[in-house]
Amino acid sequence: TSEGHFWETINAAGVLQVPLAVFVWDNGYGISVPKKFQTTKSSISDALSGFQKQEGTNGVDIYKLKGWDYAGMCEVIEPALQKMRDTHIPAIFHVEEMTQPQGHSTSGSHERYKSAERLEWEKEWDCIKQMREWVLENALAEEEELIKIEEDAKEFVKQSKLAAWDKYSAPI
């Protein structure tokens, strides 16, 4: 969101009324830097507010969502995408309060730039943890089912990693 091609794309979509959905997944940082040093107004949706469609003009629709709120996201995204398809008004989804437990790159730990408070918040509001709690609270699955799914997923990743390494290591 800090580079020219992002802004050019949003501007062109707003001018031409292209049915485009753009999702900005915001964990509060931009390449290891707090967004207050990376984004005007510390919010991409606030910075984009001048692009907001008004009566009788072109532009885009802007939606703010919380990444850990699956039900809330569904309530907003589904009708917004339908509106975008029907009207060709581009939609920008600013998904805030995302967690990123591994940081932005492999060059160093995210613990070097996130405060202890932020790291604790991320443990509590981890999107996967929140989704799991939502599934259980809404009786969409039992604890045992989720444990089995998680175990199967870990095993699948482990086997896929081994298979990829074998292919990489094999002679050409």
Question: Which stretches of residues belong to each language-model region?
Answer:
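Glycine-rich ThDP/TPP pyrophosphate-binding loop and its adjacent helix/strand module
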Residues: 2-171
